[in-house]
């Protein structure tokens, strides 16, 4: 196994390809909990393309890398997802497959894109086009993790005040602890990036 260290930011590129025509639906910067938590993925934020020449070059490189990866793997009439590391001068494809990245379908739905309707159109031989969406504000999907051991309880008042969507993987009363992998999420939120919860959305009690 040959490994190489690449300095840059990690992105998830997700979309659909029909008749060898790839349509990129989302470009999201990926975040992690850091070294102390084994770099477990903590969420995504969609990247908006501006009119700057820097952004034009960045997105052009992403489009070229996506097309080359899909062609090399002979992926067509399918969903696709790429993990890339982007530095100042290049885009490196780390992984490419036919499944969307974790919960990206929910993020696309929040953006107004029904990815499953698009996929049905593809497999039934209908033509599809890139949907028009409002990209004026970045969309964030954040995974919720326990920072200690305890019994999980939902802070319903905070959930009701949150300007976004909240989904739970755990049920109230479940014993949870600090994460060892992405499968240990308590739940996740989707919102416009500026909309942060004003209060914790959950409690961890010492007893049920």
Where would I find each of the regions flagged by the language model?
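Conserved protein kinase catalytic/activation segment
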Residues: 89-92
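ATP-dependent carboxylate/phosphate-activation module, predominantly the ATP-grasp catalytic core
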Residues: 4-11, 15-68, 72-74, 79, ...
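Peripheral (often C-terminal) accessory segments that flank ATP-dependent C-N-forming ligase machineries
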Residues: 120-208
């Amino acid at each position: 196994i040959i490994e190489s260290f690449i300095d840059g930011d990690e992105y998830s590129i997700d979309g659909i390809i029909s008749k060898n025509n790839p349509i990129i639906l989302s470009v999201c910067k990926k975040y992690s909990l850091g070294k102390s938590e084994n770099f477990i993925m903590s969420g995504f934020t969609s990247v908006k393309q501006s009119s700057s020449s820097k952004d034009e070059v960045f997105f052009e490189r992403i489009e070229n890398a996506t097309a080359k990866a899909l062609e090399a793997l002979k992926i067509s009439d399918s969903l696709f997802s790429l993990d890339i590391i982007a530095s100042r001068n290049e885009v490196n494809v780390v992984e490419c497959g036919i499944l969307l990245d974790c919960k990206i379908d929910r993020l696309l739905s929040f953006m107004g894109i029904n990815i499953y309707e698009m996929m049905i159109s593809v497999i039934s031989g209908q033509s599809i086009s890139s949907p028009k969406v409002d990209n004026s504000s970045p969309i964030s999907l954040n995974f919720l993790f326990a920072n200690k051991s305890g019994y999980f309880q939902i802070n319903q008042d905070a959930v009701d005040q949150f300007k976004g969507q909240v989904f739970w993987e755990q049920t109230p009363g479940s014993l949870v602890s600090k994460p060892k992998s992405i499968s240990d999420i308590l739940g996740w939120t989707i919102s416009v990036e500026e909309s942060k919860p004003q209060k914790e959305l959950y409690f961890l009690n010492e007893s049920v």
